[in-house]
Design a protein with these regions (language model features):
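Conserved alpha/beta-hydrolase "acid-adjacent" motif
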Residues: 31, 174-180, 209
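Serine-hydrolase catalytic machinery in alpha/beta-hydrolase-like enzymes
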Residues: 2-112
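Short, conserved loop/helix-junction motifs that constitute active-site signature segments
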Residues: 41-44, 155-162
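Short alpha-helix in the alpha/beta-hydrolase fold that links the catalytic acid
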Residues: 35-37, 153, 177-187
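Primarily recognizes the serine-hydrolase "nucleophile elbow" in alpha/beta-hydrolase
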Residues: 104-158
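Short beta-strand/loop motif that positions the catalytic acidic residue
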Residues: 166-169, 173
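Short, proline-enriched alpha-helix->beta-strand connector loops that line the catalytic pocket
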Residues: 160-165, 194
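C-terminal catalytic histidine-bearing segment of alpha/beta-hydrolase fold enzymes
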Residues: 182-228
Length: 228
């Protein structure tokens, strides 16, 4: 069950003109990605970072153990949507969409907001981008994958395929296999997503690598430039 969500923020050092909402992976929390946001913040003085923590709920993959999770996961292999927690995913999509709405209400245009995440958080971020009526600046998927793949074409809003997407994945990932990442990108391309920058990192496992962080920074500089 979704409960009140805790959020960590890294405030901009300059005038706030853009926001990045970044969601963690299974069993993690906002605190796990706070150093990532802090590391990039000095290069993006106009950006506010919003780091939500998922609610605690039982996870089938881990024997029903309760942990921070955006939705239930039954398996970490590609499957059909009948085996996937569509209800849980869409509940988390609403949660992240509410964070987007809060930023818009505070004066940040949707096209100056990037939504991204790692692993399970990336899944939610992709689903937010696919379904949100507001058009965002772009999406980030780190070690992510696509669920409800057989429904994505019917679920997505008209502008979703135009999104710039940064997608990074390690070839040595033992949790979310690199091939699943490739398959997910291919599925999105099949339904019209043509602006996906897919970067592979030889030998990298289920983590954030230094080169990947540099690539995310370079991509963000193009997508969320500061005031000239």
């Amino acid at each position: 069950m979704q409960s009140k969500m805790s959020v960590m923020t890294v405030l901009p050092k300059g005038k706030h003109t853009a926001t990045i909402i970044f969601s963690h992976g299974l069993g993690d929390s906002a605190a796990g990605w706070y150093p990532f946001a802090q590391a990039l913040a000095p290069r993006f003085k106009h950006v506010k970072w919003v780091l939500p923590t998922a609610p605690i709920q039982p996870v089938t993959l881990n024997g029903g153990m309760p942990m921070n999770s955006w939705f239930d996961i039954r398996t970490l292999t590609p499957t059909n949507s009948s085996q996937e927690d569509e209800r849980g995913l869409l509940a988390s999509v609403r949660t992240i969409s509410d964070l987007v709405a809060a930023e818009v209400d505070a004066g940040i245009p949707a096209n100056r907001i990037v939504v991204g995440g790692f692993s399970q958080g990336a899944v939610v971020s992709l689903a937010v981008g696919a379904t949100l009526e507001r058009k965002l600046a772009g999406l980030i998927s780190l070690s992510g994958f696509l669920i409800l793949a057989d429904k994505i074409k019917s679920m997505q809003v008209d502008h979703a395929p135009s999104y710039p997407v940064f997608w990074g994945h390690g070839t040595g990932d033992p949790v979310v296999r690199y091939q699943w990442g490739e398959m997910s990108v291919q599925k999105l391309r099949e339904v019209g997503w043509k602006n996906i920058q897919f970067e592979s990192y030889p030998g990298m496992q289920h983590t954030l690598g230094a080169k990947e962080q540099q690539d995310v920074e370079a991509w963000l500089k193009k997508i969320l430039p500061g005031e000239q």
